[in-house]
Amino acid sequence: MATDLRISNISKIYPGCIANDNVSLQFKSGKIYALLGENGAGKSTLVKILSGVISPDNGEVFLNEKNLKLNSPLDAKKNKIGMVFQHFNLFETLSVFENLSIDATEDNKSLRVRINEIFKKYNFSIDLDVPVLNLSAGQKQKVEIIRCLLRSPKVLIMDEPTSVLTEQETEELFISLKKFCDEGILIIYITHKLKEVLSLCDEVAVMRKGKVVSVSQTQNEKVETLANKMVGQKLAK
């Protein structure tokens, strides 16, 4: 079944700051979507709303026309929305397997079987029994992704995912995200990096000062035009 995520008139106001100003967007599975903007554009607030960390002051979120009440991260998980934050939410002194088992519902043996199936399917390779603190940034991110995949997500949101990755780790991430997309997972990619948007994503929504100012197909965009939309003026060449 195709996945349709619709954000309708979302607003969030903090003292002295309109973080999200009547934001409406629609995403469908089969594509990778970018949410692009400078720091302070409103991306992080919208991500926190979609992941249930905070609630909007106004507006609604629909998944396949079901009105989601995202009052907590648990609500997002129940509705098959997976989230990989920029700063990894892992227990450094615990092993990879111990981290993955925290939210698991099956016994350890069954869980290891499922994890190994994911490893084989996506060509992941991580020692399950080493402490997380011994992993590279790219490996830690894979642990977060695996944790999401264990819940069979319909939506996977990646928040500034390449900020601490090497070039090789970034390439590996892109390959994985394209595979997830091909399998029907709706991917929302949060970033301020223009070249990544053009090389990975199918559509891009540009945010500025809490508003969505542009939605377009990336094949029709260039770095310069996206940069102009981000800052709200034509940049000098």
Locate predicted features:
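Glycine-rich phosphate-binding loops of nucleotide-dependent enzymes
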Residues: A2-K237
